[in-house]
Regions:
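Catalytic-core segments of class I nucleotidyltransferases/pyrophosphorylases
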Residues: 123-126, 133, 138-146, 158-161, ...
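Well-ordered alpha-helical segments embedded in enzymatic catalytic cores
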Residues: 33-36, 111-114, 215
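Solvent-exposed polar/charged
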Residues: 43, 117, 218-221
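A structural signal for short hydrophobic beta-strand segments in well-ordered beta-sheet cores
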Residues: 25, 165-168, 216, 227
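Conserved beta-loop-beta/alpha segment of the NTase-like Rossmann-fold superfamily
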Residues: 60-170
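N-terminal glycine-rich phosphate-binding loop and ensuing alpha1 helix
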Residues: 1-67, 99
Length: 260
């Protein structure tokens, strides 16, 4: 099963640390938040990734092209006649990463539509945002998705408090969206989706197609959108304060998403 990650955002609300790089390349410790997300999935055995690139895509491409040199000890002849000799196998050597150009200004729905050709024959794929981490139980998430047979499962999380909430009915079926946060302690869309291939029936050809609007609203009307409840840690990196929080947790070895 492939894991699709949305990596095309500008990071306009966190320009202090993302001025010349795409948002998923903002670092936690010495590595991008994108790497942390991928590493988390890999801990559950999911190592086949499709990255939806947009703004500053060359930065992400360069990171993966040069990844082996970045993380390995090696010996190199400065004459340039021979390839470097690497001295150990690095942990991520079995990752398969497809880097897909999905447009500079394409919105989330358009980006997902454009990577359909890279999913092969898989009927199910995972999808998440390239700017948020959590300690979601990926195995339980997939099992829940398979149990109900609907088109899309999103992970419902309890947020810091500046997001629109989900209206959730019986059995986890999503009935609608509340744009303004309430004081009820409700759940929001935290990403970490599991998707049936039937999702593409809800994606039209518009570049400005926002997955979280028309397609998800249609899924709600059709009774095809379900929520996997997650009451553990979840945190996006949308502001400089959140950048500091995630780096502080990581530096103190208190990061809940670190399973490695």
């Amino acid at each position: 099963m492939k894991t699709v990650i949305l990596c095309g955002g500008y990071g306009t609300r966190i320009r202090d640390v993302a001025d010349n790089i795409p948002k998923p390349m903002i670092q936690i410790g010495s590595l991008p938040i994108l790497w942390h997300i991928m590493k988390y999935y890999s801990c559950y055995g999911h190592k086949d990734f499709v990255l939806c690139l947009g703004y500053k895509s060359e930065v992400i491409k360069e990171f993966f092209i040069n990844y082996k040199q970045r993380v390995s000890d090696f010996t190199i002849s400065l004459e340039g006649r021979e390839k470097p000799t690497y001295h150990e196998k690095f942990a991520e050597a079995d990752w398969l990463v497809t880097l897909a150009e999905t447009g500079l200004n394409a919105m989330t729905g358009a980006r997902v539509r454009k990577i359909k050709k890279y999913l092969g024959d898989d009927d199910t794929f995972m999808l998440t945002y390239g700017d948020g981490v959590g300690n979601i139980d990926i195995e339980a998430l997939i099992a829940y998705h398979k149990s109900h047979g609907k088109v899309l499962t999103l992970t419902g999380v309890q947020p810091p408090g500046r997001f629109g909430e989900l209206s959730v009915g019986q059995g986890g079926k999503i009935d609608g969206f509340n744009e303004k946060p309430q004081s009820s302690g409700g759940y929001i869309n935290g990403g970490f989706f599991v998707c049936s291939r039937r999702l593409f029936d809800y994606l039209d050809d518009r570049e400005d197609l926002v997955l979280e609007r028309d397609p998800m609203e249609r899924l709600v009307r059709d009774g095809e959108l379900m929520m996997f409840q997650h009451d553990g840690f979840w945190q996006p990196m949308d502001t400089y304060r959140e950048y500091q929080l995630l780096n502080d947790l990581y530096a103190k070895k208190m990061a809940p998403w670190v399973k490695w």
